């Protein structure tokens, strides 16, 4: 099918798990397209609000509240700390209640402190407010778990990375949106600066609530309906299959069931691909195969012991710790990049350096999906998660090399600085996408816990690296090469860890 048509056509669906095999990016009228849209759009608005303070904090809010540089740094760290805690909690909540309801809950709860920004009158009040607004950063977890539930493993890396990349771009968009709203309120409404910045935060509040209501009334929990009934479909479909009314996996004949997702296509069984012949299966054998395939990917509500084993398994740590380096570096560098540019190129001015710094976040639109796309491409060619693992290791090592080069050279040339930053952005953000392409393979029955753990480690890395920058005394180049050394060492040290535990079901 033509690529342009894939973006708008109803997706083909795997009959074993009802997950889409393509991403209808431009088709919000389709169930899968609508879920994908709200996944990235809701996360983008959350990210926009989460990062809405730095663009106005540099001058306006700082002067109005008489904040010191230390208090500004503390507010940045506190915002990351809140998100770390929320992401760790969100994982089990997604497995228990489903990602859609968790997503909606986080948006609505996080919108309240966003609307209360106008009540802040002191630095301490702003720090406390940013802690609660940090709740919105936790929406990353349900965003990824929701996408994983609707898109097949052959395409889930692209879906997850594209949703996250578009969402992360909110961190760059806010550098343009919030100053534009602020300037408009002063110019067109005649508000003084100390009132205009407070009123400006009503806009993200309205957008966040609208997105949450859209999810609530127009989207489904899973491809088969309610989250609480996700296992019922598996049992009913298996019973139906045992009677012969199933999708014929070898011939592509469609089920006689009157309802179901559109465009369901058949999956070729491995023997067909290897031998070039089709081997009909007995209905009972097909039923068992479908049951095993669905059960292996169905998210359960793990017991406390099972959750503990998942969290501290080597396979989980092998994706969580690298994400602490890649996404943690992104968060930390985002917070200092404008100041770093201003330090090395003072003649550019605050506005111009801020716009160039925003481009680091904007590149997520292309770079993060690129990592997921490459990982999916290699997986389809090799049919082994090791392909994704090797790609991840390569991206992580090169990412570290770029940070080391940038830190030791401390460029004074605009071309060199922006070139190294763009190269770093590609490998760093592609690395983020590749990691969440691999996450669905690790303990798929506890995908929420794994996603929450990995997402939480990303914020933990951001906090640690932000502290490194804070105590580097504005020697940003030194802080960047330290991040590069740490990242390279981590990616090399976990490169040997199996991407999927031996005890896990077939891959």
Curated annotation (Swiss-Prot):
The family database entries (PROSITE patterns) matched by this protein are listed as: MFS
Which segments cross the bilayer?
Answer: 35-55, 72-92, 101-121, 131-151, 162-182, 199-219, 307-327, 358-378, 390-410, 418-438
Against Gene3D superfamilies, the record matches this protein to: MFS general substrate transporter like domains
Which CDD domains does this one have?
Answer: MFS_NRT2_like
Mostly located where? membrane
Keyword list (alphabetical) reads: Membrane, Nitrate assimilation, Transmembrane, Transmembrane helix, Transport
**Which signals induce this protein?**
Subject to nitrate and nitrite induction, and nitrogen metabolite repression. CrnA expression is mediated by the products of nirA, areA, and niaD.
Q: Which residues lie on this side of the membrane: Extracellular?
A: 56-71, 122-130, 183-198, 328-357, 411-417
Q: Which domain of life is it from?
A: Eukaryota
Q: Where in the cell is it found?
A: Membrane
Q: Which GO terms describe its biological process?
A: nitrate assimilation; nitrate transmembrane transport; nitrite transport
Under the heading InterPro entries, the entry gives:
MFS (IPR011701), MFS_dom (IPR020846), MFS_trans_sf (IPR036259), NO3_transporter (IPR044772), NO3_transporter_NarK/NarU-like (IPR004737)
Q: Which residues lie on this side of the membrane: Cytoplasmic?
A: 1-34, 93-100, 152-161, 220-306, 379-389, 439-507
Q: Name one Pfam family in it.
A: MFS_1
Gene Ontology MF terms in the entry? high-affinity secondary active nitrite transmembrane transporter activity; nitrate transmembrane transporter activity; nitrite transmembrane transporter activity; voltage-gated channel activity
GO terms for CC? Answer: membrane
**Membrane-related topology note:** Multi-pass membrane protein
**Main role?**
Permease for nitrate uptake.
Q: Which PANTHER family match?
A: HIGH-AFFINITY NITRATE TRANSPORTER 2.3
Family label = Belongs to the major facilitator superfamily. Nitrate/nitrite porter (TC 2.A.1.8) family.
- What's the protein name? Nitrate transporter
């Amino acid at each position: 099918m033509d690529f342009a048509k894939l973006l708008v056509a109803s997706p083909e669906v795997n009959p074993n798990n009802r997950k889409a095999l393509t991403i209808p990016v431009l088709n919000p009228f389709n169930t899968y397209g609508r879920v994908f849209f709200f996944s990235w759009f809701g996360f983008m608005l959350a990210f926009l609000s989460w990062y809405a303070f730095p663009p106005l904090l540099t001058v306006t809010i700082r002067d109005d509240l008489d904040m010191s540089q230390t208090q500004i740094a503390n507010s940045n760290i506190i915002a990351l700390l809140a998100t770390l805690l929320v992401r760790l909690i969100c994982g089990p909540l997604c497995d228990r209640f489903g990602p859609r309801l968790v997503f909606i809950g986080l948006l609505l709860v996080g919108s309240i402190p966003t609307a209360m920004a106008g009540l802040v009158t002191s630095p301490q009040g702003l720090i406390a407010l940013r802690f609660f607004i940090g709740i919105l950063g936790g929406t990353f977890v349900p965003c990824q778990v929701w996408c994983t539930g609707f898109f097949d493993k052959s395409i889930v890396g692209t879906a997850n990375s594209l949703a996250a990349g578009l969402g992360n771009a909110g961190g760059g968009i806010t550098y343009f949106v919030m100053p534009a709203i602020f300037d408009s309120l002063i110019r067109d409404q005649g508000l003084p600066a100390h009132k205009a910045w407070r009123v400006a935060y009503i806009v993200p509040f309205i957008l966040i609530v609208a997105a949450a209501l859209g999810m609530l009334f127009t989207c489904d929990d899973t491809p088969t309906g309610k989250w609480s009934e996700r296992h019922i479909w598996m049992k009913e479909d298996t019973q139906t299959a045992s009677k012969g009314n199933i999708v014929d996996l070898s011939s592509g004949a469609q089920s006689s069931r009157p309802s179901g997702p559109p465009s369901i296509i058949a999956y070729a069984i491995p023997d067909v691909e290897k031998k070039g012949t089709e081997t009909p299966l007995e209905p009972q054998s097909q039923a068992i195969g479908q049951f095993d395939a669905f059960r292996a990917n169905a998210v359960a509500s793990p017991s406390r012991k099972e959750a503990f084993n998942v969290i501290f398994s080597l396979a989980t740590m092998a994706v969580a710790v690298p994400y602490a380096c890649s996404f943690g570096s992104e968060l930390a560098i985002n917070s200092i990049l404008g100041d770093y540019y201003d330090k090395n190129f003072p003649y550019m001015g605050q506005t111009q350096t801020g716009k160039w710094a925003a481009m680091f976040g904007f590149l997520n639109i292309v770079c993060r999906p690129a990592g997921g796309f490459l990982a999916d491409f290699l997986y389809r060619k090799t049919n082994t998660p090791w392909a994704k693992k090797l790609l991840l290791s390569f991206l992580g090592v090169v990412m570290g090399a770029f940070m080391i080069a940038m830190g030791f050279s401390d460029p004074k040339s605009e071309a060199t600085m922006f070139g190294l930053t763009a190269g770093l952005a590609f490998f760093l953000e592609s690395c983020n996408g590749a990691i969440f392409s691999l996450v669905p393979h690790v303990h798929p029955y506890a995908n929420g816990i794994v996603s929450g753990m990995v997402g939480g480690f990303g914020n933990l890395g951001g906090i640690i690296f932000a502290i490194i920058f804070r105590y580097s005394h504005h020697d940003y180049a030194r802080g960047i090469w330290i991040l590069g050394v740490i990242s390279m060492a981590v990616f090399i040290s976990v490169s040997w860890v199996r991407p999927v535990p031996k005890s896990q079901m077939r891959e």
